[in-house]
Amino acid sequence: MTTYFDKIEKISFEGEKSTNPFAFKHYDANQVILGKTMAEHLRLAVCYWHTFCWNGNDMFGLGSLERSWQKNSNLLAGAEQKADIAFEFLNKLGVPYYCFHDVDIAPEGNSVREYVQNFHHIVDILERKQVETGVKLLWGTANCFTNPRYMSGAATNPNPEVFAWAATQVFNAMNATQRLGGENYVLWGGREGYETLLNTDLKREREQIGRFMQMVVEHKHKIGFKGTLLIEPKPQEPTKHQYDYDVATVYGFLKQFGLEKEIKVNIEANHATLAGHTFQHEIATACALDIFGSIDANRGDPQLGWDTDQFPNSVEENTLVMYEILKHGGFTTGGFNFDAKIRRQSIDPYDLFYAHIGAIDVLALSLKRAAKMLQEETLQKIVNERYAGWNSELGQHILQGKTSLETLAQLVQQKDLAPKPVSGQQEYLENLVNQVIYS
């Protein structure tokens, strides 16, 4: 295998006392927690786009990162070299999965014919590398937002020919995902939204994207894809307002088009921040609506109004996220994909390892703390007591539709009900959480 990161062999677990920057302090893949290993709980994945495609550019500056494979004048040869380096990284980091967009792995070319040929060529290579390394595909997707043809959207575009081009990419990306054993297929509508309502037909665009998603579901069943379809919510950026604003919005959309049993959500932490929610809120909402699927692990900056895609570094935040996931029974086909990028000034190639090692340890420690909270029923006992009244005859009659507004009004008057407020104990609960996290 090509050696690009020749400074290290393989990242291993050395424990909390280790000072080796190229070692895990908390992530022991084989440690059993609540009946499953850490690896089985976390199902870690590295993303192709930020890790191997981004060159460090931003809106105000050119690329700052030295990536030899990006300098190859033969774009297809550069993509082959990128695949070599990507799988070297994945193998040395020791994660079980990776994720990609179609044009992350292969150059788009100048025609649909070139696009298909290039994509299939690299998929052949990825298939061989998966066999060689044992690394698997968590999910694939199609980039239907970067090319200028998508400036007015993909499925929501006013031109049906653009809709057809997006369908072509999704068709090929879904087929490749199935071929590579991908466990999910993600749909992120990067430009499925609007800049101004002055030139937008909201009803029409909603119907267009609804039909597009129905076609995706139809194709899934046609080819026998056994993985999970996922929509990734995001409120804005690059458009002013996106139709998949947050988890609750996506659920309403799925219900409208009869897709709530077919598609779940891939939740990104930074997107929750942009939507004005906590990461925990979005996870809890998805679990409550039974559409929780997978996670893009990263963090945003509350002081900034854009997608910073930083690596997760808060055990406090992720313990509560992990707690919600464990309560829900954990992942089925989903996992933690690091949709995160190193900072533009992090120009050492090994900064990629530092970033992923630190983030993986954060999730591992968060898992251990969340498992302790779940086992000790630290919070659940108080929540159960708080809602105990709904297990009474009155509560059950209300929920089962055995009473009415009139009946309840009569009951309150007859019994002169005067319910007394009970403390929510928020401060006490916060203390309990901190006690678990910092013990």
From Swiss-Prot:
This is Xylose isomerase. Homotetramer. It comes from the Bacteria. It is an enzyme of class 5 (isomerase). GO terms for cellular component: cytoplasm. The active site is at residues 101, 104. Belongs to the xylose isomerase family. Its cofactor is Mg(2+). Signal peptide: none annotated.
